[in-house]
Amino acid sequence: MVASDDPRLARKVRRLGRLDMPGGGQVVVEGDYAYVGHLNPPYGTSIIDVSEPRKPRIVSRVMLDGEDTHTHKVRVIGDLMFTNYEMYNRYYFRRGDNIHEYTAKLEGELGRPPSDAELAHALTEDLYVGGKKKVLTEADIPILRAARERGYHDGGFKIYDISDKTEPKLIKHQRTHAWGSHRFDVDENYIYVSTEWEGYVGNILVIYDIADPARPAYVSHWALPGQHIAGGETPTWNADDNRVHHGMRHGDQIWVGALWGGFYVVDVSDITQPR
């Protein structure tokens, strides 16, 4: 957070208060409270009393176990708080999925098992983390091997009871697939989740009924043309470069942002058959 009163930073805007806290990915404000989804574990979600803007105060925090997950998106509907649950540093750890493939490829080229340094060089191709080129070293290879063996099984979203803002209570951890949910929209009836899904490449849009928050029920899903590889489709892009980033519902439409691919307007007048 910027802690400067330099008038050149903004026009007709002045800072009333500030908090020194870990960085956030999404901030939403409902009534007297702000909800911050933090970017980096172990910090999950903070609930902040902003009834006195000059004196904001943290009333509770949801902390995460371990370093495998981040929950940087948050939304609130009434007394329910929703957060994503997504594999942290996923582009980096995903390279571990390719270790066996690259080991076999290099062994064929070299006529011997590759060293960790050679594997790191091969796996570095087209690897970007946080928008920056990531160069792997031989020290990364044991980490990636361990992550591959460990796997990731927690991806999805969580629903909390926040009727008492000082003590959020977990209602449900809904697992989706693979690295889990990135961003989402939600209303009183449904949650619209961007998540990986069995049989598809990259994130697609998946809709759940949340009438009973303790038992979210799958309703339907929608994907970009070319994502359904299990159904015989072939993407025209590399890996998961194009995918559903998130959708926002407006009336009977969901406006879906496609990463590096523009946007789509999806008709959900029949929620069971998005088109």
Language-model features, listed with the residues they occupy:
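Feature marking well-ordered beta-strand scaffolds used for ligand recognition
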Residues: M1-R275
